A protein has these predicted regions:
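A glycine- and Lys/Arg-enriched "phosphate-lid" helix/loop adjacent to the NTP-binding pocket
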Residues: 51-93
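Short, flexible helix/strand-to-coil boundary loops that buttress conserved ligand/catalytic motifs
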Residues: 6, 18, 26, 67-68, ...
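NTP-dependent small-molecule kinase module
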Residues: 92-120
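Short amphipathic alpha-helical segments
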Residues: 43-46, 66-70, 114-117
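ATP-dependent small-molecule kinase phosphotransfer cores
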Residues: 1-47
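Short glycine-rich anion-binding loops that position phosphate/pyrophosphate groups of nucleotides
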Residues: 35-39, 60-62, 108
Length: 120
């Protein structure tokens, strides 16, 4: 599991592995759903921006918590001691920075999918 890898090798290993995979991705893929920590790598985000539109599904923290809980059981590529609130506050400005398009994450999954299909 991601949490086991993080415990054994550290969260920076997870982030580096994520960056390596992104940079090895060919630019002919239509949709790439990255891990949440991909946004920490300027190199990865610049690469993705070079051939695609980056879509940020802006979802309020309380709704994220409803969907995934507090994150303790979920593997998070973040330093120990950071909770989902800390991660959200740290990542949200980065998602905004890199987004070409921002969608409302409060909408239904069906509405979001329809919007994305219309965009691509």
């Amino acid at each position: 599991s991601l949490e086991q890898i993080k415990k054994n090798k550290g969260y920076k290993f997870v982030r580096q592995a994520e960056e390596d995979v992104i940079l090895a991705t060919e630019n002919n893929i239509k949709i790439i759903s990255t891990g949440g920590s991909a946004v920490y790598s300027d190199k990865s985000m610049a690469y993705l921006s070079s051939f695609s539109k980056i879509i940020y599904i802006n979802t309020p923290l309380d709704l994220i918590k409803q969907r995934i809980g507090e994150g303790q059981e979920r593997g998070l590529a973040a330093p120990d001691g950071m909770d989902i609130d800390d991660i959200y506050r740290e990542r949200e400005p980065l998602y905004t920075k890199w987004a070409d398009i921002t969608l409302d994450g409060k909408k239904s999954i069906e509405e979001i999918i329809t919007t994305i299909i219309d965009l691509i």
